[in-house]
Amino acid sequence: MTRTAKLALEDGTVFTGSSFGASGEVDGEVVFNTSMTGYQEILTDPSYRGQIITMTYPLIGNYGVNEEDVESARPHLSGFIVRENSRRANNFRATGSLGDYLEKHGIVALEGIDTRALVRRIRTSGAMKGILSTEDLDDKSLVAKAKSSQGLVGRDLVREVIPESPIEWDEQLSSWAKLPGEVSSGSNESFHVVALDFGMKWNIARHLADLGCRVTVLPGIATASDVLEHQPDGLFLSNGPGDPEPVTYAIETIGQLMPQLPVFGICLGHQLMALACGARTFKLKFGHRGANQPVLNMETGQVEITAQNHGFAVDEEQLPDHLVVTHRNLNDNTIAGLSHRKFPAFSVQYHPEASSGPHDSRYLFEQFLANMMAVRTPTPAGR
């Protein structure tokens, strides 16, 4: 039996379609993702906390879901919107359908609306607060709820997704996450990396482990002394959800550790590192979400196609002199990468682990290892 569901935006726009997930009512910031595949990774990425995701590709769910392509233990997004949900999972790895997976995990989902019209409205007017409901179907009521709902600005969503206790990571990349012919390289040097988890995707830790690193995952609320107790060779700053500026505890910790350890940050970790250096961030009009974002490497001149998922960016107009722009997003020329002039610290505003997405930027993990090696074995004087 088809169940009616509605999406109401704070500007008064209402879309009516059918539910294919759980029953209920949720609020969130309505955004869009341009990826053609990788929906299971998107669903389980903690960075999507507080958001209602619209997929721009018209047919989603073709290959079902499985037990391997997950980036955390459960979905974290508020709601999910597609043009058409494929009820038939046509893949030998599938263990179930997308709709059943969403219903099992309590995710409200909507199909059958004009997603092109919705995405165009977001692109023109910017990301908006919205309500997705299978219960209240009154347009005026839903719009009023959307207007009064919380947005992302000023909210600390990190505390809602971080682990409760430290984890000694012991899992490497699965065969499906590797490039053809790629094997776990290991390393001639065993580095101990502490990863501050602000909502980390599991494949990031798997990449570090695959390179031979010992990885200790600490909750994002860990202090500098908590980190140093583990005597790490390097500090990794993970991705995570929402506005970076309210995450003041992490900004303070990073600022204390940057003079002492090599640092590599991605996505939210990139923004937090910049804030720790005295920079500021701002909210993008509709964000960067998708596996096809072009980025220019300022040093090499090469263009890298990257996977991105963020609604905030570092403000170049307030960038301190000790930070250097290393990468730029070619769609809007915003900062996509930074490095510190004095300390072995760098960061990027995208996902080099490519789960899902292109593999153009995997070299950044090797760069992190090289920085740890350089600190461990400093160049003798006179060379």
Describe each region flagged by the PLM.
Residues 108, 192, 262-264, 280, ...:
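Proline-centered loop/turn at the N-terminus of a beta-strand
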Residues 301-343, 379-383:
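Catalytic beta-strand/loop cores that center a nucleophilic Ser/Cys/Thr
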Residues 19-20, 57, 308, 339, ...:
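Short clusters of small/polar residues that mark proteolytic maturation junctions
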Residues 233-234, 238-308, 313, 357-375:
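Cysteine-nucleophile active-site neighborhood
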Residues 192-196, 306-307, 346-350:
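Active-site-proximal beta-strand elements of phosphoester/diester hydrolases
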Residues 85, 240, 343, 353:
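Flexible loop residues that form catalytic
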Residues 6, 45, 294-296, 326, ...:
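Residue-level detector of beta-strand face positions
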Residues 1-225, 229-230, 244, 355-357, ...:
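RNA-binding accessory domains that recognize and position tRNA/RNA substrates
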